[in-house]
Amino acid sequence: MSSILSRYPEAETPVHGYFYSMVELAVVRVFVQHQIFDAIADDGTSIEELATKTGMELNLLERLSNFLVASKVLSSPKPGFIGLPSETKMFQQRRAKLFYSHIFDAFMGSAVKWPQYLQNNGLAEPQKSNRSPFGLGAGYPDKSFYDVLEMMPERAQAFNSTMAIGLGDMPITGIYDFSWVAAHSGTDPERTLIVDVGGGKGQAIKAIVEETPSIPASACVLQDLPNVIKDVPEEEGILNQVQKVGSSFFDKQPTKGALVYYIRRVLNDWPDDECVTILKNIREACASDSRLLISENLLPDEPSVSLAAADLWMMNFAGKRRNVRMFNDLASRSGFEISSIAKDKTSNSAVIEMLPVQI
């Protein structure tokens, strides 16, 4: 707790420090939303001029600014003026503004509902995607994250805009060696080599084939919901050759006996029981020599602050970051066993290879 006290020297106790932190988070969100940071000149701007430029009432702006100056988020070059310290100038950048707004709205709105959520659902992590802190915080306690986004287009737009800037994106290639897949292409030309399950608009399957061009794109299948598949760009090259199938991973796997079933950044979004449903659907479609490749962030047994926070972030949506033990549990419940884990050298990304257990 010493860090919260050092952040706010006036804090008499850690509780005071946490309170000041809550105030700061909220005031910064208001400044971001109303472009207050953008209107502050490099050499400082008077409160009166800033109120005129932004349309905020002078009294309100002064009260909010007083706290940010006291907490060193803003500077005060002279009485009645405020300026931006170098570290705060990031809030003039679109990337930082989008990210901060998203994590504040999506995380804080859900986190404040944790006590009520746990009281309603028991002291356990989310068991169903349609019973999540996010849904409760948004006013739809029986809807999943994606259901809520469909009903709240403004939230969906903010979410999509943040995802589009690629914050913390996972590497696709350079982790797992797909060359063995290419070696199989000549043994059975009719066999599907890779099925990209829940593959969105094909970024992953395209990158995999680009990395290992001896894998015929025509022997690969891109699967996602029909409304996603119809928006896959029509372009010359790899994606034009890949087979496209509209389906849900919660339904029976339509492509049987593929050499590889590849699923990236999917299980992260779902609670255990729904992950088991997804994996069982794949298991039922496997041939005896099929392999399942799961590309996800792998949680270490003793995660850092950032990784533990990311896991709790996912909990808001009924998702979950998993460690090796947790993936082993999913495998055993779904008819698979882990055969290898390939880890990225510069991140926590990994490709977990599983084999179907012969029954």
UniProtKB/Swiss-Prot annotation:
Drop me one GO molecular function for this one. Answer: O-methyltransferase activity
What is this protein called in UniProt?
Methyltransferase fsa4
Tell me the function of this protein. Answer: Methyltransferase; part of the gene cluster that mediates the biosynthesis of HIV-1 integrase inhibitor equisetin and of fusarisetin A, both trans-fused decalin-containing tetramic acids showing also antimicrobial activity. The PKS module of fsa1 together with the enoylreductase fsa3 catalyze the formation of the polyketide unit which is then conjugated to L-serine by the condensation domain of the fsa1 NRPS module. Activity of the Dieckmann cyclase domain (RED) results in release of the Dieckmann product intermediate.
Q: Say yes or no: keyword S-adenosyl-L-methionine present.
A: yes
Biological or metabolic pathway of the protein: Mycotoxin biosynthesis
Keyword field contains Kinase: no
Instruction: Provide the residue positions that the database annotates as binding S-adenosyl-L-methionine.
Output: 198-199, 224, 248-249, 264-265
| SUPFAM superfamilies named among the record's database cross-references | S-adenosyl-L-methionine-dependent methyltransferases, Winged helix' DNA-binding domain
EC numbers = 2.1.1.-
Keyword list (alphabetical) reads: Methyltransferase, S-adenosyl-L-methionine, Transferase
Tell me which InterPro entries the record gives. Answer: COMT-like, O_MeTrfase_dom, SAM-dependent_MTases_sf, WH-like_DNA-bd_sf, WH_DNA-bd_sf
Domain of life where this protein originates: Eukaryota
- Family according to the record: Belongs to the class I-like SAM-binding methyltransferase superfamily. Cation-independent O-methyltransferase family.
Q: Tell me, according to the record, the phenotype of the null mutant.
A: Results in the loss of production of equisetin and fusarisetin A.
Q: Name one GO biological process term.
A: secondary metabolite biosynthetic process
